[in-house]
Amino acid sequence: MINNWVSSSKELQLLVDDYLLTVNYRSVIENDLVNYTQGIESYFRNERLTLRDKINKFIEELPESYRELLSEHVGNTDDWIGKLVSTRVFLTHGDRENMAVSNPYKLVQMTKIFGFMVRIFILQKLGITIDKPKILNKFKNVLTTH
């Protein structure tokens, strides 16, 4: 793992930095969502893609079992990505027409699920695998904490 970290790309290090901002410092959930999306944007910064396409690519790079877990809990992944992007646009630019998720509970759930997937992505890039029962347990904890 240490070798993987030392040899990791600058983009992965930027993603990890944004992820750690959310887990090491208390902030409002809206900032967490912005930090996660900023991390994904940084990771794919050398690719000419929209934020929506970057998040889609990020999800496509997750192992299939995690993509399935995501779709089990959010329904249509494409719609979920659209809500995620629209909410981030609102939080960043204040355009209320783009606020896709205004319900605080749903915003917390969406952000926690997104953060969980970012964590899995980072661990995968560092070569760390976690057994499925342990992941399912951690995911349940994410869904039940506020």
Language-model segment annotations:
Residues 1-146:
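Amphipathic, oligomerization/interface secondary-structure segments
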